[in-house]
């Protein structure tokens, strides 16, 4: 009887080992099969710093005139510092702990190239802090950093208690435009005078609490500026509709909220009020009004043949937006998931895209403007959660993570 019990235990142990092995083989293995190679470099420096664990989630990257790619980070998992770094695709160099100079800022949310090869950035903080007025968050700052001198300058707070979600610069006219978070106000900043202008609420965001975490949906994630100085963005139209008399319930609401999403608006230079362009972001029918999804523009880049390439949040579509004619041309999608969160041109002339849900595998896709083909290349590594891509001076695609200990993958396209 004792031997039978021992045999049964060994059999159960064998089944557990077999099950775990099958599960491991059943998991998706990360791989990008095309191109010359894929390697990665670590952003965080470990316990010794200066970029500690929890401070290396990458928020943006831009290629500067000195040939280096500069990136920004945000704090995660309760960490408090955000940083600027730069890389040549071989190693990462820390250049600035921004929180040590502007206290209370835990995220550099966006970067732009300013006049004179100066970096312009904006800041924000944790959603939990923005959700609690008692935390006393002073507000998101604009700042500048000069790579040639290593000097940074605080350009001030835009809105008390509000972070800054995204910015874009009109270099010809010396203007910066941005969107506050979570209030969703469009604003401008004049570099010469230092004055700001609040154009008011362009999106009434809805507060979402998922698994105990608070966030706000619908706030524009990207701004586009054309040569005429006109600013474009996507937003929702929200209105309250009265219930019919027979629909009213005792003690219940007399109205319901209706949303119309993915509307592309423009603010012409010198105007005070944005207007609807008449076109909307491509979406699956019926999803434009669903509050569970964000139907908007996740990413945008100037197209080399005119207009802007844009990636959508809700469906992961790639589309071309022509501001001069208010035309949208949908190119479709090449993967199952959604959220084309970042775009970059590679050295081979193709448009590369980063897609995927915020807390899931990140996929690399490419669009060939010569053939019109969209292909899914795979993902850097199983469970790699990436936030942004950027081409370096060699035309390689840098793919950056937004985790506690983040890596940058360096992908070299085929010629």
Label the model's feature ranges.
Residues 75-79, 125-130, 183-185, 238-241, ...:
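Short glycine/acidic-enriched loop and turn motifs that connect beta-strands
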Residues 68-71, 119-120, 175-178, 231-233, ...:
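Conserved beta-propeller blade signature
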Residues 38-50, 96-103, 154-160, 199-215, ...:
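Surface-exposed loop and turn segments in beta-propeller and other repeat-based domains
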Residues 63-66, 113-116, 169-173, 225-228, ...:
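Residue-level detector of Asp-centered blade-edge/turn motifs that repeat once per structural unit
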Residues 384-415:
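Blade-level signature of beta-propeller repeat domains, shared across WD40, Kelch, NHL, RCC1
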Residues 55-60, 103-111, 162-168, 207-212, ...:
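Repeated scaffold domains used in trafficking and secretory/extracellular systems
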Residues 47-81:
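Beta-strand-rich domains and repeat architectures in extracellular enzymes and scaffolds
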Residues 74-76, 121-137, 235-261, 356:
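Short, conserved, GDST-rich strand-edge loop motifs in beta-rich repeat architectures
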């Amino acid at each position: 009887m004792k031997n039978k019990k021992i045999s049964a235990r060994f059999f159960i142990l064998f089944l557990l080992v077999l099950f775990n092995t099958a599960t491991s083989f059943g998991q998706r293995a990360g791989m990008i099969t095309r191109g010359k190679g894929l390697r990665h470099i670590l952003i965080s420096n470990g316990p010794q710093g200066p970029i500690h664990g929890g401070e290396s989630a990458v928020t943006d990257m831009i290629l500067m005139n000195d040939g280096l790619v500069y990136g920004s980070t945000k704090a995660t998992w309760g960490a408090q510092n955000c940083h600027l770094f730069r890389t040549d695709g071989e190693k990462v160099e820390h250049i600035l702990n921004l929180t040590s100079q502007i206290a209370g800022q835990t995220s550099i949310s966006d970067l732009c190239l300013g006049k004179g090869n100066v970096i312009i950035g904006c800041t924000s903080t944790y959603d939990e802090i923005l959700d609690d007025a008692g935390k006393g968050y002073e507000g998101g700052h604009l700042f500048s950093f000069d790579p040639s001198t290593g000097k940074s300058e605080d350009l001030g707070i835009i809105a008390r208690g509000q972070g800054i979600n995204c910015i874009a610069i009109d270099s010809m006219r010396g203007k910066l435009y941005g969107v506050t978070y979570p209030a969703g106000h469009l604003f401008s900043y004049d570099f010469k005078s230092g004055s700001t202008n609040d154009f008011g609420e362009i999106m009434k965001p809805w507060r979402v609490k998922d698994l105990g975490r608070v966030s706000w949906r619908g706030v524009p994630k990207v701004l586009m500026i054309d040569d005429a100085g006109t600013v474009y963005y996507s937003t929702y139209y929200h209105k309250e509709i009265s219930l019919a008399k027979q629909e009213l319930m005792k003690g219940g609401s007399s109205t319901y909220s209706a949303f119309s999403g993915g509307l592309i608006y423009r603010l012409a230079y010198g105007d005070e009020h944005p207007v609807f362009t008449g076109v909307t972001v491509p979406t699956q029918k019926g999803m434009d009004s669903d509050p569970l999804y964000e139907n908007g523009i996740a990413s945008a880049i100037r197209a080399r043949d005119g207009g802007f390439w844009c990636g959508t949040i809700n469906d992961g579509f790639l589309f071309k937006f022509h501001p001069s004619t208010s035309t949208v041309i949908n190119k479709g999608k090449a993967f199952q998931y959604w959220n084309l969160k970042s775009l970059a041109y590679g050295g081979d002339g193709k448009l590369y895209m980063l897609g995927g849900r915020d807390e899931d595998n990140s996929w690399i896709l490419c669009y060939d403007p010569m053939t019109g083909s969209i292909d899914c290349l795979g993902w850097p590594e199983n469970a790699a959660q990436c936030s942004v891509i950027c081409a370096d001076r060699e035309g390689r695609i840098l793919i950056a993570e937004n985790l506690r200990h983040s890596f940058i993958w360096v992908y070299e396209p085929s010629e």
